[in-house]
Amino acid sequence: MPSIFETDTKLDQLASVAIARTKELMKESDKLRDRREKANRRRVARLFKDPKAIEATITLTDEVMRISSVTSSSRIFRRAAKKASILGFGPINGIGLHAIGILSNVLPKPVVAAVHQRVRALSKDLILAAEPAKLAKHLGKRTEKGLFLNINVLGEAVLGDHEAELRFQSILEMMRRPEVNYISVKLSSIVAQLIIIDIDGSINRVSEKMRILYREAQQHGVFVNLDMEEYRDLPMTVAAFMRVLDENEFVAMKAGIVLQAYLPEAHHFFGELVQWSKQRYARSGASIKVRLVKGANLAMERAEAELHGWSPAPYRSKSDVDASFVRLVDAALRPEHSSAVRIGIASHNLFHMTWALEVAKSRGVSEQVDIEMLEGMANAEALAVTRAGQPVLLYAPVTRKDDFAAAVAYLVRRLDENTSDENYLKAAFEISQNPKKFKEQEDRFLRSIAERHTITTESLRHIEHSQLMSSTFENEPNADPTEPKFIAAVTKEIRRVRAIKNQEIPLVINGEEIFTKEQEEGTDPSDNGKIWYHYSVGSRKDVDTAIATSQKAQEKWSGLSIQERTDIFLKAADVMAKATTQTIAVMSRDAGKTVAEADPEVAEAIDFARFYATTAQNFGESTPLGTILVIPPWNFPYAIPVGGVCAALAAGNTVILKPAPETVATAWEIVSHL
């Protein structure tokens, strides 16, 4: 999905102008810093120089603040306090943490309470109090300084409809406040259990909530920006945004959406949004806003990809993300769509910010741009930009006092992002007084301007990759629910399997399919127990024949060489891998499993086959027992029986598979694959 916009090399010459303007903003920012902000910057700069202090700080916020048990919380606090150094925390705080850590042995409750109070106090500029009086007062002060706020109601990830509804109501309540006129909302925070495989169904569900949200916005004059974090939410969020705003009720409404530059697909979706918004603008005269950010979910995206065996969705390096960001700026600030698409430049990197402003100026679209920053992260810089004539919108997370634990994840993420060596904010605390750090950031900026011309805009998640078999075992990757080919294939198979009526499943003995008179019903637990197949039930004679057959075959099977068994297991693994979507579809109807539940089970079964293939040499001197009876449970109808069958076969035994009566259709898939 490449970008539809070519880069403009003429803009490269604006880099020198941006650098000069950045120096001016830094000087002005230093003048505007009050005593409190200067002290905070010294404290943070000191903290960032000491990895142990960073680790201790993350422990304090991410663990001590979240744990309800005072005993456990105090124990973790003592561990963190031991890591507190004078280098990272300064003499007073460093010694104080050690002393309080010792005190927590005898007075855990007051110590933990004091820690909570201190963390809240230190974070009050980053996370605002959601209580009406406090928030209204803060908004008033910001407005007096020419700053505006984009409110984001923080909270834990929603797990069910009840939690989603509570969050939704808290957002609606915030929108009804007279002082609030701009709010950001993640669709995943107001609709629970979004299923990416069923993207149409998920879009329908979120669209219902969006209509309520937009009606409230129209009534109270609030601008709504759709936020997102997870890569999987990107296509759904963009599609829902366009669908609802195309409806007659909302076609004349202004609204916004975020795009994350650390995802290559952002370029494709930006092009899609531009083309759509121009048509919509021609119909109604209403514009949209695209908020360009670099991305704030990198660690989670990488962890999820590694866990499932996927290719990570984001760019691989910070320099690539920077190049992607300025390429988006190049594509965004253009006169041909300036009326239809407003652009939010959301970055604390003054080099990128000033370059964007120079690009807008050179193209005559300065009125198209909003500068956006994070509340509490760079107050003086925000004021300096405002005084230079460019209004600033501050992204402001809010939470109620009794829900502060939900804000801890935000704090940890901000800390994790800003402590990266390549991150501009880490350098920003000293950059104006440190020529070396300024030069480092200047060079990174110039590199991003140059590399924007060549940075790929093709998906990195969906790149073709093959698993080469080696002597080292590797897990089978889980199917990627964001992969269009997989979605299409599994959807097709589910429809095919759900159309099956009165399938008959035989016994298989000595390679012969046997349909007996005595049969049992196979039902669909997800469809009120509807009967969709019948399976044959063996008699005593059938059992005796099966045992005799397996005993006779045992000598031949155990006589195969290690390499011959290895080849058979590898072939079986390949067959199972190719039949993944079919197996998922059968399990969904036979065991009532969702795609997310069934797919890892198929991958686990493939792992069993490949594991025993790569470790077959360990069974070379084993003595087969003979015939092994595998009787699996119904709740893991594919992986467990495959694991049992493969283990027995690898040791030279023969196997009789007696499936759970509730999931015979799944067992029939296993037999077909093996």
Feature locations, PLM:
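Positively charged, amphipathic and often flexible ligand-engagement surfaces
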Residues: 1-475
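Catalytic cores of nucleotide-enabled group-transfer and carboxylate-activating enzymes in metabolic
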Residues: 129-133, 143-149, 159, 219-224, ...
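Conserved hydrophobic/aromatic pocket- or pore-lining residues that grip, position, or stack substrates
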Residues: 151, 529, 565, 587, ...
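Active-site-adjacent "gating/activation" loops or surface patches in catalytic cores
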Residues: 200-204, 301, 515-527, 536, ...
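Active-site-adjacent beta-strand anchor residues
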Residues: 227, 346, 536, 631, ...
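Extended hydrophobic-aromatic, low-complexity segments
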Residues: 343, 354-356, 424, 531-534, ...
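Short, structured beta/alpha segment
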Residues: 426, 430-589, 611, 618
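Rossmann-like NAD(P) dinucleotide-binding subdomain of oxidoreductase/dehydrogenase enzymes
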Residues: 588, 614-674
